[in-house]
């Protein structure tokens, strides 16, 4: 698929290793953007999350999107330039750990759709391997993000269900929101949307089912994503 058109922006992705996915769309629609003035997108890929969050936030909210792969970063910049939010999103082509160690900025919201899989059989495409396989643990990603999180800020990830459970147990941060994502009613959860904070809060837990028994989108999924998908 060379491109993906949403209601208010278009994503070109022919040069990007990892394409627009339901996981990314869920995170971009689900993350809590209240009171956000500065947002960080870790591992921006096509620029999808940065653009979704720009659509959902006020004009005074600035977004920094960091992407290591120069080819993906170039295409993400093109996608940003073609949007109405190009003056609110800054694309930075660098390693996320280096960026977090050198920036003085703190963020009210940090989002990531990190590489899911442990290093395994090499992909034929080096860029796809970089995007698909993690050489760092998800805990590392979370701990890096926490170093630049504002005192009342939030970190939101989308992860495989088991990886999400492991991360909750491993971190010293507080999990304040957890949504278990079920592809079809009656199935077990496959993904987990998570929000972490420095300060303890009452944990909000729920689930999101994408398809009902008739393979139709559920009302909950439509409600969450209707501002983005053309079909809703």
UniProtKB/Swiss-Prot annotation:
GO terms for cellular component: cytoplasm. Gene3D superfamilies: Vaccinia Virus protein VP39. The keyword Ribonucleoprotein does not apply. GO terms for biological process: methylation; tRNA processing. The keyword Cytoplasm applies. It comes from the Bacteria. It catalyses: adenosine(37) in tRNA1(Val) + S-adenosyl-L-methionine = N(6)-methyladenosine(37) in tRNA1(Val) + S-adenosyl-L-homocysteine + H(+). Pfam families: MTS. Transmembrane segments: none annotated. Keywords: Cytoplasm, Methyltransferase, S-adenosyl-L-methionine, Transferase, tRNA processing. It is found in: Cytoplasm. It is an enzyme of class 2 (transferase). InterPro entries: DNA_methylase_N6_adenine_CS (IPR002052), SAM-dependent_MTases_sf (IPR029063), Small_mtfrase_dom (IPR007848), tRNA_Adenine-N(6)_MTase (IPR050210), tRNA_adenine-N6_MeTrfase (IPR022882). GO terms for molecular function: nucleic acid binding; tRNA (adenine-N6)-methyltransferase activity. PANTHER family: TRNA1(VAL) (ADENINE(37)-N6)-METHYLTRANSFERASE. Belongs to the methyltransferase superfamily. tRNA (adenine-N(6)-)-methyltransferase family. Specifically methylates the adenine in position 37 of tRNA(1)(Val) (anticodon cmo5UAC). This is tRNA1(Val) (adenine(37)-N6)-methyltransferase. It comes from Haemophilus influenzae (strain PittEE). The lineage of its organism: Bacteria, Pseudomonadati, Pseudomonadota, Gammaproteobacteria, Pasteurellales.
């Amino acid at each position: 698929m060379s491109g993906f058109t949403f209601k208010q922006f278009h994503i070109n992705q022919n040069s990007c290793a990892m394409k627009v996915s339901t996981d990314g769309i869920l995170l971009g629609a689900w993350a809590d953007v209240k009171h956000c003035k500065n947002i960080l997108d870790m591992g921006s890929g096509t620029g999808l999350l940065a653009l979704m969050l720009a659509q959902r936030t006020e004009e005074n909210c600035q977004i920094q999107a960091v992407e290591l792969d120069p080819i993906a970063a170039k295409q993400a910049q093109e996608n940003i330039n073609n949007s109405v939010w190009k003056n609110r999103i800054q694309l930075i082509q660098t390693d996320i750990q280096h960026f977090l160690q050198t920036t003085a900025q703190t963020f009210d919201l940090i989002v990531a759709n990190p590489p899911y899989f442990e290093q395994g059989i090499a992909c034929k495409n080096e860029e796809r391997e970089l995007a698909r396989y993690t050489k760092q643990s998800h805990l590392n990603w979370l701990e890096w993000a926490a170093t630049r999180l504002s005192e009342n800020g939030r970190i939101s990830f989308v992860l495989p269900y088991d990886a999400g459970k492991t991360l909750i147990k491993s971190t010293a941060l507080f999990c304040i929101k957890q949504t278990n994502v079920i592809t079809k009613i009656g199935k077990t959860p496959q993904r987990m949307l998570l929000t972490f904070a420095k300060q303890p809060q009452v944990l909000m837990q729920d689930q999101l089912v994408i398809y009902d028994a008739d393979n139709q989108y559920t009302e909950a999924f439509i409600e969450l994503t209707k501002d983005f998908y053309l079909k809703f």
